[in-house]
């Protein structure tokens, strides 16, 4: 591809600086060579265009790698609008490169929560030829924010009083205010959106958790594909991606030497495993906290100390939350930490650390060091450093996962979007996982790039195992 952005005049975007488009295009060209799976799928479907004219809204970190995903969806026919799924994760040159080609994108690094949710609404607002405002036919979600907004808006139009209940957080208050405004400005809008909405593919653990909660309550409005639990996503993006990007975020934020430090990793799922491995590779002494006896045993078998967070206070130099749960690090924990401790999160949402409560605490001085690095000084003179306001440190303070591992995830996303559209009339309103043969195909598409040569089963060997020579090779219940 040409490394100079081909600018298409249009104003349907909100970004930081369109002049960054050429820089973004150069980095996109580099990323494409590191994303063999996604590019292979793009080439395979470029002529048939299985998503021709399908309206797709994306809510996913507006990075260089995501830009390659967006252009893949466009090349196979989709009509795309995009927003980021985090206020700090946008790479402004990536957003500019996409906006310059005529794709509506609404994202910049350092949005307020009000701006973030306005951008989400902009991304899911399509205009029909007759001027009617409607929504997407498919959604690419990361964390479930678009899915949440549509469901809550539709419930409001059908008598829900949720928006009138007291907000449990500042962000919930912002969402409720937005829904009230839409109810006045666009009566009946969410019913029109739901009428055409055919499905969602969800990228991350937290968003999948939301989907299953909605489905179990009997309120899921559309079929959903759980991309996160494809093996080539969770065991690669979550694990190997974090193994590289966590240390990158810490280094860029604090320029700190990790060797010899005591690092506390809260949670030992796939993200926790990658985070613990990242810190240990740099020579940190890693302590893991866990609620799950199986994960705790795994951590111990890997040689990590497994203990409670309370036992680490006063000796931990670095704290990383990875759980997808709330209130993992409380204000009381923060006050009891070692002077100059570094605190960050690599789970999707910002509620793993009690940031709102910290900001409301009397007698605490907040000093901004640089973007996404804040020092909090307590009354006793001790201080902690909070990175990215408790949001994703690898995207807030660095550039997220490398392109190669994201090619796995985004290949799955693209296949999920095609699958949802092709089966839009047969899928039920429940959560699906992509079939095993597609999981294996995604892996296969990445092997040549890294010099892997597979052994081939003989027919006799395949019969002995009870599998096809071409796979799938493992049953659905197999745990990789």
Curated annotation (Swiss-Prot):
Top EC class of this enzyme: hydrolase
Disulfide bond residue pairs: none
Cofactor note: Binds 1 NAD(+) per subunit.
Entry cofactors: NAD(+)
Location(s) in or outside the cell: Cytoplasm
Gene Ontology CC terms: cytosol
Residue sites binding substrate per the record: 63, 142, 203, 233, 237
Positions with a binding annotation for NAD(+): 204-206, 238, 267-272, 290, 325, 346-348, 394
Record field: transmembrane: none
Major location category of this protein: cytoplasm
Catalytic activity: S-adenosyl-L-homocysteine + H2O = L-homocysteine + adenosine
Pfam families: AdoHcyase (PF05221), AdoHcyase_NAD (PF00670)
EC number: 3.13.2.1
Keywords: Cytoplasm, Hydrolase, NAD, One-carbon metabolism
Family statement: Belongs to the adenosylhomocysteinase family.
HAMAP family tied to this protein: AdoHcyase (MF_00563)
Function: May play a key role in the regulation of the intracellular concentration of adenosylhomocysteine.
Identification of the protein by name: Adenosylhomocysteinase
Name of the gene this protein is made from: ahcY
